[in-house]
Amino acid sequence: MIQFTQKEIEHLRKKKNECPQAILRLEEEVKDILEEPLLIPKTGIGNWSLYYYCPDCSVKLDFNRHSPKAHRCPVCGKIWTGSPYYESWWWIVSMENYEAAFRMALLYQIAERKDCADTVSYTHL
């Protein structure tokens, strides 16, 4: 898919100097993906994020990229494990990967960040 024409890319590269905070924001949003190993499930797994809620308190569980099997409720503190929380955790990870891939593609095109292109290319394997 072609997101921008070459002319549009050149225009955006010129504009980045007028709005450096936009690039800084994109960089902050992809920081975890660039600094840590990319999380990709070995099998097709995932479930609606609507299941990532405490059934007792009806609030979204605290998401932690480093805790795929324990999911804490911010209200009652209970730790939820197993299905559907584990699968929903993977759905959230997959969405973060997707959003980060788009942002890294922008950083590559606009800020010419080759490290972002390398990471995005890896996600297509």
Please state what every model-predicted region is.
Residues 1-125:
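Extracellular glycan-targeting catalytic surfaces
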